[in-house]
């Protein structure tokens, strides 16, 4: 399977995994549309396989459902951006775009989380002002790492109090 085929396979997985039930998603039509999209991009070209998949590989490190929602929201946005630069008058492109927009609406929280991660990566950790602020935050960060989530804690406290 070529890199482009892998990427379009990921697109199919995203569409199935989030926001759609079997009755609301016509997989046969979607696969046909993706095949037409592959033809539009000439994805059978020999250079597509060079270096392996570019999107599927990124998904391997994201294991939890909430983690996957973050990365998948970015992937959906990438596909929408890719389709913005194509001929939107073609029915198959319009259909894929509509499905992706629906998925994007279901994954809208991921963009904010990715922005937070990028903002953290941009912090100048050699800046004394950043050091001061980070030192003030350190105990709170460590507490969040040590303390169980409040919902689990509340449930376990309730079970201890209950004399069932």
Curated annotation (Swiss-Prot):
It is found in: Secreted. Glycans are attached at residues 42, 61. Keywords: Antiviral defense, Cytokine, Glycoprotein, Growth regulation, Secreted, Signal. GO terms for molecular function: cytokine activity; type II interferon receptor binding. Residues 1-19 form the signal peptide. GO terms for biological process: adaptive immune response; defense response to virus; humoral immune response; macrophage activation; response to interleukin-18. InterPro entries: 4_helix_cytokine-like_core (IPR009079), Interferon_gamma (IPR002069). Produced by lymphocytes activated by specific antigens or mitogens. IFN-gamma, in addition to having antiviral activity, has important immunoregulatory functions. It is a potent activator of macrophages, it has antiproliferative effects on transformed cells and it can potentiate the antiviral and antitumor effects of the type I interferons. Belongs to the type II (or gamma) interferon family. This is Interferon gamma.
């Amino acid at each position: 399977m070529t890199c482009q085929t892998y990427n379009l396979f990921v697109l199919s997985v995203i569409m199935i995994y989030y926001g759609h039930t079997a009755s609301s998603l016509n997989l046969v039509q979607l696969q046909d549309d993706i095949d037409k999209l592959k033809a539009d991009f000439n994805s059978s070209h020999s250079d597509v396989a060079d270096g392996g998949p570019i999107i599927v590989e990124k998904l391997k490190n994201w294991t939890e459902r909430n983690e996957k929602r973050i990365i998948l929201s970015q992937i959906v946005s990438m596909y929408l951006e890719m389709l913005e630069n194509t001929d939107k008058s073609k029915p198959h492109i319009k259909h894929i775009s509509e499905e992706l927009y629906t998925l994007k609406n279901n994954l809208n929280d991921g963009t904010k989380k990715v922005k937070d991660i990028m903002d953290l990566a941009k912090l100048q950790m050699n800046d004394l002002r950043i050091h001061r602020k980070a030192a003030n935050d350190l105990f709170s960060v460590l507490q969040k790492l040590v303390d169980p989530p409040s919902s689990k804690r509340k449930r376990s406290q309730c079970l201890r109090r209950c004399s069932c």
